[in-house]
Amino acid sequence: MRLSLETRVAEDVTVISCKGRIAYGAEAAALSAEIAELVPQTRRVVIDLSGVEMIDAAGLGALISGVLTAQASQCSVELAAPGNLILELLELTKLISVFELYPTLDAATVASRGQAA
C-alpha cells in the first residue's frame, strides 16, 4: 500500500498520521517534504506510525532528516505508535536514541500537555 499522509493539529502539536509504507522513492520524499513544510510553523511534530506497514532505509532517512531539520528550527519531531518491526529496526540500526518515542498518539499528546505546564 502506498503512503498516505494526514496532517492535523491536536492540542499544541502537529500530527502527521502515516498509513502504508515509507519506502525509497515517492513515499519517503513525501514524508520529508511534509515535515520540512511543517517545521517552521510549529514547535512540535508527532509522526503517528500506527498505520505504517513497512519502512526501509530511505524511510528511516526521511525520519532522521526531519529530526535534523526540526532541531535547526527549535522544533521537535517525535514518533508515536511505532510497531514492533519499526522498533526492532530502530534498535538494530542503533537509531532508537535519535528519536523521542511514545507508545501511542495519546501518550504523545499527554506528554505535550505536561511540557506546556
Language-model region placement:
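Short acidic-hydrophobic, aromatic-tinged amphipathic segments that line or gate anion-handling sites
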Residues: 100-104, 108
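Non-catalytic signal-transmission and effector/linker regions of two-component phosphorelay proteins
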Residues: 1-9, 113-117
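Ser/Thr-centric signal marking residues that sit
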Residues: 7, 93, 104
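STAS-typified acidic loop motif
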Residues: 5-33
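Conserved catalytic submotifs in the C-terminal HATPase_c
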Residues: 10-11, 50, 82, 106
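Amphipathic alpha-helical interaction surfaces in cytosolic regulatory modules
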Residues: 22-99
